[in-house]
């Protein structure tokens, strides 16, 4: 079954190992084989990463889109998730869910679950900031 992907004008996406950018008009694509697909809104650039959960998301993104270096990215992911759960045990259930998806090679779903991890981190950081003020 093909994946239907709609790109807005100027929107980028990763399809397989290629970064594509749409032209002036909305376009509908059908991806007919099993390759990583990420929309621009789901892509995190290394220079934009600043928090532990963002680093975990980036490691997962690389696990998904860079299969040639997957063992290295998985090791980075392991180290980052260990550090996070030691520092903040409240993240353990979300991290365990993500790692279970990774173990099942469900990398896209793990990436989506990592969005929840990032949201939880943002909420905690917001609460800390509000408490200080």
Locations of regions flagged by a protein language model:
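Terminal leader/tail segments of proteins
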Residues: 1-133
């Amino acid at each position: 079954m093909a994946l239907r992907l709609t790109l807005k004008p100027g929107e980028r996406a990763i399809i397989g190992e290629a970064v594509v950018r749409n032209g002036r008009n909305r376009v509908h694509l059908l991806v007919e084989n099993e390759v990583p697909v990420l929309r621009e809104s789901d892509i995190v650039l290394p220079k934009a990463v600043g928090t532990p959960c963002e680093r975990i998301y980036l490691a997962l993104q690389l696990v998904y889109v860079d299969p040639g270096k997957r063992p290295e990215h998985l090791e980075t992911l392991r180290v980052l998730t260990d550090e996070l759960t030691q520092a903040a045990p409240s993240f353990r259930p979300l991290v365990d869910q993500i790692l279970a998806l990774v173990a099942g090679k469900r990398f896209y779903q793990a990436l989506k679950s990592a969005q929840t991890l990032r949201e939880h981190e943002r909420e905690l950081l917001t609460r800390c900031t509000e408490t200080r003020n």
